[in-house]
Design a protein with these regions (language model features):
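Ankyrin repeat A-helix N-terminal signature
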Residues: 23-28, 55-61, 88-94, 121-127, ...
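Solenoidal tandem-repeat scaffolds enriched in leucines and small polar residues
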Residues: 145-158, 178
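Intrinsically disordered, low-complexity regulatory segments in ankyrin-centric signaling systems
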Residues: 8-38, 47, 58, 70
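Ankyrin repeat structural motif
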Residues: 29-37, 61-69, 94-102, 127-135, ...
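Ankyrin-repeat-protein effector appendages
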Residues: 8-23, 170, 203, 236, ...
């Protein structure tokens, strides 16, 4: 999962006073913002769905956020991609902002258009403090995106062991699969991060679970040429002759991708052609 931050592009249809307000939030001039907000709707959304509160969260303007709530700002209004202010705080790793938004009624399980919760995005961006605050506030660590990915999948994909530990200690399930049938071990086998693989195996992840194509984590290691990963999997009981849906075992995958060292390793352990 790769997330692109909001660009905050402006339409020529936006009023000059609205654009000035946005700039005032960016530079942190609260008194000027108060003047500009006189007689306006604090919950007005521009063509991208942004509100003054949304912008204040992005720029980490705590004083603006608190003032906007005094004016009746809606904490859960999302932009045109479904991102709420809490999503933005998670992306930017703003634990104090997260607490403020949560105290004002922010939906901790809100999903954007891709099904990502704030915790998904914190995990994806490596925002440890934000993730910790969300978990402590009761965020569901096993929530799935539209692709079936969990926050654990995201933290594994980004090789963040601290976040993985946090999620595991908070009840993250190792065996959950994304829409392609891939577990967290499939993901780490692709990325080639040995310490994370060892940690997941220590926690009891099932090593021979197949994805939707019938391929195991060892198939992935063979595909990407991760020799030490393949060795680790074999010593932990990986089935060296497991066949995918197309009938290919890890050794066939290694041959197809030119990973000769892995071919030799599999032959050493008795892999059949």
């Amino acid at each position: 999962m790769v997330f692109l931050m909001p660009s905050f592009a402006f339409s020529t249809n936006e009023s000059s006073s609205r654009l000035l307000l946005y700039k005032t939030i960016e530079v942190g001039d609260l008194e000027k913002a108060k003047v500009l907000l006189t007689g306006t709707d604090i919950n007005y959304q521009d063509h991208l769905g942004y509100t003054p509160l949304y912008k204040a969260v992005f720029y980490n303007r705590q004083d603006f956020v608190e003032y906007f709530f005094e004016l009746g700002a809606n904490v859960n209004l999302s932009d045109i991609e479904g991102l709420s202010p809490l999503h933005v705080a998670a992306l930017e790793d703003l634990p104090r902002m997260i607490k403020t938004l949560k105290d004002e009624g922010a939906n901790i399980e809100a999903k954007d258009d891709y099904g990502y919760t704030p915790l998904h995005l914190a995990a994806d961006q490596g925002s440890f403090n934000a993730a910790q605050n969300l978990v402590f506030a009761g965020a569901n660590v096993n929530n799935r995106s539209k692709w079936g990915g969990t926050p654990l999948h995201a933290s594994v994909a980004n090789k963040n062991l601290d976040l993985i530990r946090l999620l595991m200690n908070s009840g993250a399930k190792l065996g959950l699969k994304d829409r392609l049938g891939r577990t967290s071990l499939h993901w780490v086998a692709e990325k080639g991060d040995l310490p994370i693989a060892k940690f997941l195996l220590l926690k009891g992840v099932s090593i021979n679970l197949p994805d939707n194509d019938g391929e195991t984590a060892l198939h992935e290691a063979a595909k990407w040429g991760h020799l030490q990963m393949a060795q680790l999997f074999i010593t932990h009981g990986a089935d060296i002759n497991a066949k995918g849906g197309d009938g290919r075992a890890p050794i066939h995958i290694a041959i197809a991708h030119g990973n000769i060292e892995i071919v030799d390793l599999l032959k050493k352990y008795g892999a059949s052609f």
